[in-house]
Amino acid sequence: LIDHLRSTNEKIYINEDKNCDVAVIWSVLWQGRMQPNKEVWEKFRGTGRPVVVLEVGGLRRNSSFKMGINGINREADFANQTYDDKRWPLFNHQFRPWNQTGNVIVICGQHHNSHQWRENPSLKSYFKNCIEEIRRYTDKPIVIRPHPRNIVHNFPEHKYKHVRVNLPKRDWNTYDDTDFKKILSSTWAVVNHSSNPAMEAVINGIPVFVSEKSLCHDVGNTDLSDILHPAMPARQNWANQLAYTEWFTEEFREGTPWARIRARLEERYIKK
């Protein structure tokens, strides 16, 4: 992205704010090397200036990357109001028919230091609340699946009937994928607040229960009272628009995603 911006003579500053119109940061996970980005986020958003967020993609992890305005997932504006069916095939995904492959309900955690989690309780409380809500409607077995880099220790799984914790295992044939696909081979539904596991489940034909912040909201369910009869809507139009949330490295270099984002910034976010 920086290479492209320089090639088009955009005025850019690295790690300094010279009264800039927009900030660009990597991720809204306020941890480690990304912790300083929180100050940038708060400074720009607090003064009404937009923040473009880059992060790892969910369609082709570490090959494609998301780029959105003022957030991630469904909270972001991806400048994808216009889209077609030409981009989705680039990600080489084939939808599996909607088909519950088993009887297990999988609850996927997220990282508690992410901006996406700011309005939620602790992960232990989240898992507990989900279990108790699901148990109002079914005694199907439940698997708790923590985020691979945010393991929840000492969760009292034995306190509940037919509940177990399944820790993600690294797939060493990939950069940092896990064995989530294996879990999907025996799954009734996936419960996930707003992160990528829901997307993987939908593509593989497993119904999902998500929040309004999830990119799978339009093809998912939001009320666990429907756990025994989840909706399984058409997915192609959703996928066509989703494909315009992620871009490949060469496209960043060519400026394709920036052209969309820049136009949207000027249209809606940058004060003139």
Label the predicted regions.
Residues L1, R33-E39, P121-E133:
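Well-ordered, non-membrane alpha-helical segments in soluble/globular domains
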Residues L1-S27, S114, R268-K272:
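N-terminal pre-catalytic "stem/leader" segment of glycosyltransferase-like enzymes
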Residues D17-K18, V22-R118, N240:
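Catalytic core of nucleotide-activated saccharide and alditol-phosphate transferases
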Residues C20-I25, G48-V51, K66-G71, F155-D177, ...:
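Active-site regions of enzymes building and remodeling cell-envelope glycoconjugates
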Residues W26, L54-V56, R145, P168, ...:
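Generic beta-sheet signal
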Residues F65-G102, D218-K272:
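Leloir-type glycosyltransferase catalytic cores
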Residues K128-T174:
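Catalytic donor nucleotide-activated moiety binding site of glycosyltransferases and closely related
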Residues D176-T222:
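A donor-sugar binding/catalytic signature common to diverse glycosyltransferases
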